[in-house]
Structure formats: structure tokens, C-alpha cells
């Protein structure tokens, strides 16, 4: 059976719309003709990767020489080569995200919030007086194995399967099929074992990214709070319901907790942004984002007269799904964005895209700094902006 290869490419700014197909399927990156050592599958994967990078990659000119490593006659590791040739500047990796995979099902499930998981999000810490580690639970997905045994935010994990946590076994907390956790507790400024153990079996489940939503009365005004962990497609309509509720409750400000949100689909990003923007901005169809592609594609779009702006709107569509967000415009005057190193991509985009039009105050540490979006391309060619 021939594997289907799937290539994720990142492009400057944060919204992908239409594109062009490449007329010359022969591509480049051909070998010297001294002899072919690759299988048909690997030959195709190299050629596919070269053609896609040569058409869509933002830094295609900067990595033109490196792309020759995707010689289909001799390169036996196209997946590794794509990672190796990603754009760098002064030997520092600028593009940390472009990747190629032959496991499309797992990648799509991950984007759609489906995972084989224990259902917790963990932060790793290290003891100052030893080489051992510990975990602190950041949050737990409702209905997950971790949720069912009572694990909650702030809990401490000190052992995995009866052993201290080290650099050699810490990944078992995430990537095993079952595990026994030795729980910890804090006493007198120190962390130690509590004596409690919990055993979990991983399950395949949808991880609902809407972690918490509630309204507080603060000094005579109503303030909403939304903790959100991923801009997946299934949560878009749920966000509309939540914003309708916030509107009904009369909130004037919103605490938007994106500390653990690494991004997701542009479609869902737009749904949320267009409901949080001032109503007059939405009705005036002001510019929300502008796409920047590589030089060749920018010239192509210019010749076609394509508009590369995304405008605020009361309707959000991605071609297959349309959501009316006009009724859910919350009417808030300020957003407090809770951010950290796990805040990336669509999360950063929402906050930055709203800043010209309303008060947005950022609270927390530095965000991840992923100022790019991506398209997914597979065979047969299918592009999904996220």
C-alpha cells in the first residue's frame, strides 16, 4: 500500500485563503543521473516535497540550495530532510514548524482535538538538589481518565510506575497506554510523596478545548472569563453559544485565558475574534489580517487582482462551513489576555488582530512567537488552512 505523505508549510501572517496549483508536475531537485537508489515511494515523497516547497514555502529563495538535498534518486529520508532544510538565520532556526509526515490520520486527529490520552496537561519541573523531575497539572479535560480519578489543576506527580521521574522516563506520563502515578504534596515549602497512587488507562477521546467559562461581578461590573486550549473546528459553534451567554449576562470586559493554547484553525480564530471586536468595527468590515506569501505567489495574486486581506464580518465561512456570529457580538470594551510560552499562532493572532480596535492588555510571560500560519498539502492535493 502506498503511503500518503502530508506536508505542513508555514506562511507569513495568520490567514490562508486561496492559492494556485503548479502546472509543471515534474518539479525539480532531480539527481545527476548516476543511478537511482530510492524506492518508488521514497522517490515520490522527495519529488512531492520539493514541488510543494518550491511553490508555497515562504522562504523558498533562502533555502533554494538546500532543497537540492531532496534529490529523489538518492535521498532516502525525505521526512528528515524537510526538517533539516527549514529556514535558518545565522545558524538559528527561524522556521521551527514546517514538517512532513506519512501518518496523516494522527496529524488530522491531533488538529481536530482527538487523541489517545490520559486527559491532563502537565508542566515539567526539576528539583534543584537532584537530577529528578516532577509534574504539576496545568488542567484536566472533563470526562478524561485523569478527571475520573480526581486529578485537578495544581496536583503534583512525583513518580511514574513506582519510579522517580527522570529524563529517561518522563515521557511515559504522556505516551504510554497505562500508568500508575505517585502523587506528591507540598509541606513546609518542600515537595514530597503524599502516599497516594492513581492508575490510569489511556483512551482515545475528543479533548474539549473550552475548559472554563464563567462571569464574575467585579467592583460593580461584570467580567467574563474564558479558558480555551485549542482553536479546533468542533468548538467554533460552542464559542458562539458562550459569547451569546456573555452578551446576555452583560459583561463589559473579558479575561481570555490562552496560556495553554497553541493555536488551531484560522476559521475558528476568526469566529472568536469577530465576536469580541467592537460591533462598529465588524459592521464597517475593517481589516483584520493581511496575508503575505513568497515573492512568486505575491506576484501571482497581484496579477489576478486577489485581495489578500481578511475583513471583520458577521459571517465566517471556510467553504464547507458557515457560522453567523452577528448575534453573538459581546460588546466588550477591554480584553485581558492571559499568555505564556504555550500561547502560539491563532492565540497570538486573535490578540494582535484586535489591538488596533480595542483595549487589549497582556498579562503573563512571553508568548511563543509563532507569527505564521500553515497550509496542509497531501496527495491528492488538499490544502487545509489552520
Predicted feature descriptions by range:
Residues 342-344, 357-371:
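Short, well-structured beta-strand/strand-turn elements
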Residues 59-70, 258, 283-291, 325-328, ...:
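Surface-exposed patches in mature extracellular/periplasmic domains of secreted proteins
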Residues 1-4:
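Positively charged n-region of N-terminal signal peptides that target proteins for export
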Residues 6-11:
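Sec-dependent N-terminal signal peptides
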Residues 266-334, 376:
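Gly/Ser/Thr-rich loop/hinge elements
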Residues 16-19:
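C-terminal motif of bacterial Sec signal peptides marking the signal peptidase cleavage site
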Residues 21-254, 262, 268, 278-281, ...:
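Flexible, low-complexity junctional segments that flank or bridge functional domains
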Amino acid at each position: 500500500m502506498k503511503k500518503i505523505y502530508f506536508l505542513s508549510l508555514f506562511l507569513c501572517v495568520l490567514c490562508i485563503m486561496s492559492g494556485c496549483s503548479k502546472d509543471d508536475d515534474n518539479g525539480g531537485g532531480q539527481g545527476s543521473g548516476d543511478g537511482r537508489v530510492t524506492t518508488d515511494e521514497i522517490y515520490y515523497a522527495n519529488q512531492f516535497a520539493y514541488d510543494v516547497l518550491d511553490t508555497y514555502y515562504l522562504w523558498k529563495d533562502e533555502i533554494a540550495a538546500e532543497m537540492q538535498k531532496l534529490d529523489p534518486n538518492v535521498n532516502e529520508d525525505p521526512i528528515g530532510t524537510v526538517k533539516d532544510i527549514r529556514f535558518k538565520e545565522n545558524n538559528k532556526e527561524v522556521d521551527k514548524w514546517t514538517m512532513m509526515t506519512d501518518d496523516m490520520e494522527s496529524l488530522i486527529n491531533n488538529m481536530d482535538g482527538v487523541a489517545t490520552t490520559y486527559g491532563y496537561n502537565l508542566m515539567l519541573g526539576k528539583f534543584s538538589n537532584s537530577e529528578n523531575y516532577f509534574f504539576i497539572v496545568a488542567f484536566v479535560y472533563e470526562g478524561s481518565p485523569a478527571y475520573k480519578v480526581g486529578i485537578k489543576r495544581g496536583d503534583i506527580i512525583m513518580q511514574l510506575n513506582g519510579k522517580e521521574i527522570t529524563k529517561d522516563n518522563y515521557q511515559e506520563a504522556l505516551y504510554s497506554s497505562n500508568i500508575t502515578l505517585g502523587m506528591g504534596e507540598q509541606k513546609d515549602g518542600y515537595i514530597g510523596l503524599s502516599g497516594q497512587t492513581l492508575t490510569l488507562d489511556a483512551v482515545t477521546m475528543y479533548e474539549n478545548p473550552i475548559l472554563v467559562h464563567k462571569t464574575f461581578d467585579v467592583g460593580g461590573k461584570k467580567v467574563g472569563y474564558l479558558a480555551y486550549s485549542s482553536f479546533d473546528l468542533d468548538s467554533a459553534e460552542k464559542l458562539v453559544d458562550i459569547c451569546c451567554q456573555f452578551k446576555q449576562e452583560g459583561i463589559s470586559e473579558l479575561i481570555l485565558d490562552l496560556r495553554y493554547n497553541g493555536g488551531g484553525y484560522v476559521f475558528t480564530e476568526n469566529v472568536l475574534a469577530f465576536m469580541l471586536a467592537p460591533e462598529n468595527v465588524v459592521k464597517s468590515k475593517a481589516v483584520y489580517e493581511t496575508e503575505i506569501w513568497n515573492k512568486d505567489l505575491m506576484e501571482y495574486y497581484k496579477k489576478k487582482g486577489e485581495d489578500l486581506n481578511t475583513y471583520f464580518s458577521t459571517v465566517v465561512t471556510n467553504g464547507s462551513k458557515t457560522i453567523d456570529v452577528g448575534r453573538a457580538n459581546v460588546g466588550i470594551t477591554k480584553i485581558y489576555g492571559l499568555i505564556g510560552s504555550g500561547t502560539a499562532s491563532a492565540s497570538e493572532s486573535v490578540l494582535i488582530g484586535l489591538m488596533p480596535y480595542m483595549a487589549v492588555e497582556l498579562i503573563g510571560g512571553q508568548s511563543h512567537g509563532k507569527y505564521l500560519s500553515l497550509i496542509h498539502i497531501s496527495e491528492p492535493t488538499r490544502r487545509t488552512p489552520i
